[in-house]
């Protein structure tokens, strides 16, 4: 009789990762539950928030592990999270860009540190509750594909996962939709089958960026000038941390035509605004591109690209650059291309690679 494979499940206390653990137990795997403790849970706002690392979530994950009868461990990565995600979040805003902390967390914490912990515990692979699909080509090379439910596909958030990491990662929910996941959790008698999804950046409870910056980075709330494209002052902003490209609300400017944030000028502490048509651009530059190809491409190729999670993929030409970046040329101009965010490109439903918008 062969020994069942050991699998570690990244358990966040949500329905997706809990259903993942239950499904793998049912399939006969030897399952270990792992939860990352990432942020100080002492704040009452964090404890009751809809973030992904609230105190209630640790309790829920532990209770699910007890229900399933699996070993369960909490791994403290608070210092790593602070440096790699929170400090980067602050520094990115200070540079006049808009960060994507969930991608950074996946890159540095979940699929690096936690994966190494899982393997050290003797697991054959790490499973997560992401809605994405891992496949292998004819040569056994791992590939990352979009989840089968377009409304829940999370492959965009996983583009930094390396091929070496993909060899030891699984996404059991990739072929399912959210309703099926909830039904699965209900079938296993998990108490959180109807639990709400996390919505907020986990260290910014209730999405109150001003309160977060006031405590963690007050320099990002330094007022400065709101200027038009010609440099004329139109008013005063509340600090660069309160704005992002494409934003209209909260500018507090009386103007005959609607104005939108076009760029954040960090050296001069200015918010540059303009009309809606000025938001459209037909190209962008990426740095730190991660290729999910056995041999990274060197020649331009046609692709479908996403400039943000909620955006549909659009036709584009990807031109790899010798410095490890890429130039992306869109067939049609795209609205509010935002420095600091990610652009991910696909061959059909397969992730080819992605990088960070300059």
From Swiss-Prot:
**Which BP terms in the Gene Ontology apply to this protein?**
tRNA wobble position uridine thiolation
E.C. designation(s): 2.8.1.13
Q: What class of enzyme is it?
A: transferase
Protein's UniProt keywords contain RNA-binding: yes
Q: Which Pfam families match?
A: tRNA_Me_trans, tRNA_Me_trans_C, tRNA_Me_trans_M
Q: NCBIfam families, per this entry?
A: PRK00143.1, trmU
GO MF annotation list: ATP binding; tRNA binding; tRNA-uridine 2-sulfurtransferase activity
Put simply, this protein is called: tRNA-specific 2-thiouridylase MnmA
> CDD domains per the record?
MnmA_TRMU-like
Q: What is the annotated role of this protein in its UniProt record?
A: Catalyzes the 2-thiolation of uridine at the wobble position (U34) of tRNA, leading to the formation of s(2)U34.
Region Interaction with tRNA, as annotated, extends over: 152-154, 308-309
Q: In which residues is ATP bound?
A: 10-17, 36, 129
Main subcellular localization, coarse class? cytoplasm
Annotated family: Belongs to the MnmA/TRMU family.
Checking HAMAP family in the record gives: tRNA_thiouridyl_MnmA
Keyword Disulfide bond recorded: yes
